[in-house]
Amino acid sequence: MKYTTFGIISLFLSVTWALRFELAASFEPKPFCIRDFVEAGNQVVITMESDGRVGDGQVLSFYVIDSMGNEHRRKKNFAEKLNVAFTAPSSAVFDVCFENKAEAAGRSLMRNVEVNIESGSAARDWDKIRSAEKLRPAEVQLRQVEEMSDEIVERLNYLKLREERLRDTNESTNRRVRNFSMAVIVVFAALCAWQLNYLKNYFRAKHII
């Protein structure tokens, strides 16, 4: 049973997810973005591979930017394989965006792009760590599980703090709306009282009442 469980964990850790898509060339290309989340201090490794070549009538560009406004990498007119690595300065959502600009009219062109994004423990070079610390394969896998568990806890804590901030913002907005509504009611009531008093004085002046 222990070996079966450990084998399942090993299989889970060895899975690598990649996104493949086609990006048509256009004179005014719209960005095609892939979004992910990373905790503060974690390393992110992005591997991109495209078919075609530089000078084939298409200018494939990309940039990496996070929700805090930090631009981690930008490159224009790339083909084949490219690796990008950066360390997140803060917990944030980041976007990997692609644009494919056509250089000439009359041709229907596109690029096939494959993107693989790894962060945290998945982005570390575990073979190098195993050699440096002289760890056995089982110890390496346990270290991976431990780090992944820590990352899950960190992400849950971040989501909890974010939920608290959103709740505080929501409650503050509700208070402002309620206070504004009360102020509108008071002003409306005062205006009605003033209008009634004005009409009463007007009718008295005209000897209507």
Swiss-Prot record:
This is Endoplasmic reticulum vesicle protein 25. It comes from Eremothecium gossypii (strain ATCC 10895 / CBS 109.51 / FGSC 9923 / NRRL Y-1056). PANTHER family: TRANSMEMBRANE EMP24 DOMAIN-CONTAINING PROTEIN. InterPro entries: Emp24-like, GOLD_dom. GO terms for cellular component: COPII-coated ER to Golgi transport vesicle; endoplasmic reticulum; endoplasmic reticulum membrane; endoplasmic reticulum-Golgi intermediate compartment; Golgi apparatus; Golgi membrane. Residues 19-178 are lumenal. Residues 200-209 are cytoplasmic. It is a single-pass type I membrane protein. Keywords: Endoplasmic reticulum, ER-Golgi transport, Golgi apparatus, Membrane, Protein transport, Signal, Transmembrane, Transmembrane helix, Transport. GO terms for biological process: endoplasmic reticulum to Golgi vesicle-mediated transport; Golgi organization; intracellular protein transport. The gene is ERV25. Constituent of COPII-coated endoplasmic reticulum-derived transport vesicles. Required for efficient transport of a subset of secretory proteins to the Golgi. Facilitates retrograde transport from the Golgi to the endoplasmic reticulum. The chain crosses the membrane at residues 179-199. It comes from the Eukaryota. Residues 31-119 form the GOLD domain. It is found in: Endoplasmic reticulum membrane; Golgi apparatus membrane. Belongs to the EMP24/GP25L family. Residues 1-18 form the signal peptide.
